[in-house]
Curated annotation (Swiss-Prot):
Mn(2+) 2 binds at D13, S63, D462, H463. The gene is gpmI. GO terms for biological process: glucose catabolic process; glycolytic process. This is 2,3-bisphosphoglycerate-independent phosphoglycerate mutase. CDD domains: iPGM.
Length: 531
């Protein structure tokens, strides 16, 4: 089977719509070609947050749920909503894996480590879930509880960890001082996802061996000291508590990792559990330090096959007949292309939690989705992406144009990470450069794919970010938004419906463009108006 006109889904990660403002990097970047597209082709504004992507009302969207819904064609109740319900009903305290972990700790007279992003951002975690498990552990009679906290500052305002942890200390006091903050780490270190093992190494030391790492005697003073040297929550240097000198992770201890989103939990969790993981073949780690086979590790959700612990509190229920899977079954040839930072998003997440591409790391002969191929472009090795706001967008486009010229693919999924990843640095000017870079790359792609190869581009985003770099209080905004996002379709022969569009309608719309029947699993309709 071969489609009449190939379709390219271009996902501009973090590209939202907002009113003109000095903090609107999208608007201020003067994206001339995007404006040309809007004047030339049908386009609309679509929902990408809250209930429209399976999240609680008014919850900002994120890359994971955005990509899931772009490929799903239906609303999928997301992890945050599920765990909020489990917490509210106290079912989390009855979860089989969590209860077995409590039993394990009591039997071994060992420590329970609660580890995760301690934040109310709701993108990777929510501290309500960790606190619920903490209270459940106390009710179960556990008294040796260690908090290994990861601080946010990216999906929240930059400096909220002080207040969050102050409240946690008060909660510990209210519970007869059961529990201690054993270590702290900014997410820059503990939640790296791009194999920067030098960062993971420091976080690992704070949790596991206490070697060559900072320490503190007063956690609040330590955070204040970090703030004074312009380290916001994301950048807090890992440290351990001197009052818990022997509280490092040991044999027979248990960890419950409370992050529910996989991508930034995979690397540190794999290091903690899997001796065959690439980090242990890397000079950053030595075999003698590995204790993963002597602990019980529980993740809230499935992270990756590289996390070898079998203990998952809420096992996945992958979606079926997502766009990629459906096209594969029809014998259509497809390509996924992104840089390292976002490769899991155009594979694992876009495929509804099905790991056909090994989280984007499979070689083409290892992919378990028929007729599917991948191009992985390395991300720049810089400390923060405002140092290179172009990221790897030019290299992605160069490779993509090579692939387009082959005239082989019926469907291509492309992710440009710039608006999101540079937006997260809080650097407004750099984010404007990031947006302008994408404008230039879209022009190159349009010339080759649409004008020379008669393809159709569907240009959209997974969530907003770069359009609000300064919040209403005048503070730097690094987090995602609840903004609407554009959907532009480069087909002059169609009209689009304007009735509350949402990004989950992108998949059925692409099938409609291909003149392919929409499967029953896709509960939403196409946005194309055939009247």
């Amino acid at each position: 089977m071969k489609v009449k006109r190939p379709v390219l889904l271009a996902i501009l990660d973090g590209w939202g719509i907002s009113e003109p403002d000095k903090g609107n990097a999208v608007d201020n970047a003067n994206m001339v070609f995007v404006e040309y597209l809007k004047k030339t082709y049908p386009w609309l504004k679509a929902h990408a947050s809250g209930k429209w992507v399976g999240l609680p009302e008014n919850q900002m969207g994120n890359s994971e749920v955005g990509h899931i819904h772009l490929g799903a064609g239906r609303i999928n109740l997301e992890s945050l909503a599920k765990l909020n319900h489990e917490t509210k009903t106290n079912n989390i305290a009855k979860n089989d894996e969590i209860v077995k972990t409590f039993e394990y700790v009591k039997k071994n007279n060992s420590a329970l480590h609660l580890m995760g992003l301690f934040s109310n951002g709701g993108v990777h975690s929510h501290f309500d879930h960790m606190i619920a498990i903490y209270k459940a552990a106390i009710d179960y009679g556990i008294t040796n509880i260690k908090f290994d906290l990861i601080t946010d500052g990216r999906d929240t305002k930059p400096k909220l960890a002080y207040d969050f942890i102050k409240d946690l200390l008060e909660l510990i006091k209210q519970n007869n001082n059961i529990g201690i903050i054993s270590s702290i780490s900014g997410r820059y270190y503990a939640m790296d996802r791009d194999k920067r093992f030098d960062r993971s190494r420091i976080a690992y030391n704070a949790i596991v061996n206490r070697n060559n790492v900072r320490s503190f005697t007063n956690i609040l003073d330590y955070i204040q000291q970090e703030y004074m040297i312009n380290h916001d929550d994301e950048m807090i240097i890992p440290a351990f508590n001197q009052d818990d000198l022997n509280g490092n992770l040991k044999a027979n201890d248990a960890i419950i990792m409370t992050n529910f989103r996989p991508d930034r939990a995979i690397q540190i969790s794999s290091i903690l559990t899997n001796k065959n993981y690439i980090a242990w073949q890397n000079e950053a780690f030595s075999d003698a330090e590995f204790i993963g086979d002597k602990i019980r590790f529980v993740s809230m959700m499935k992270y990756s096959d590289s996390v070898t612990s079998p203990h998952i509190a809420y096992p996945p229920k992958p979606l079926t007949n997502t766009l990629g899977q459906y096209l594969s079954q029809l014998g259509l040839k497809q390509l996924r292309i992104a840089e390292t930072e976002k490769i899991a998003h155009v594979t694992f997440f876009f495929d509804g939690g099905n790991d056909y591409f090994k989280n984007g790391l499979a070689k083409n002969d290892e992919i378990t989705l028929a007729n599917a191929y991948i191009d992985l472009i390395p991300s720049a090795k810089v400390a923060t992406y405002d140092l290179k706001p172009q990221m790897s967008a030019v290299e992605i486009t160069d490779k993509l144009l090579e692939e387009i010229k082959k005239d082989e693919f019926d469907f291509i999924v492309l992710n440009f990470a710039n608006c999101d990843m540079v937006g997260h640095t809080g650097n407004n000017k750099a984010t404007e450069i990031a947006c302008k870079t994408l404008d230039e790359q879209l022009k190159r792609i349009h010339e080759e794919f649409v004008l020379r190869h008669n393809g159709i581009m569907v240009i959209t985003a997974d969530h907003g970010n770069a359009e609000i770099m300064i919040d209403k209080d005048g503070q730097v905004n690094k987090k995602h938004t609840t903004s609407l996002v554009p959907i532009i379709i480069t087909d002059l022969n169609i009209k689009l419906k304007q009735n509350d569009p949402e990004i989950a309608k992108v998949a059925p719309t692409i099938l409609d463009l291909m003149n392919i029947e929409i499967p029953k699993e896709m509960e939403l309709e196409s946005m194309i108006d055939h009247n």
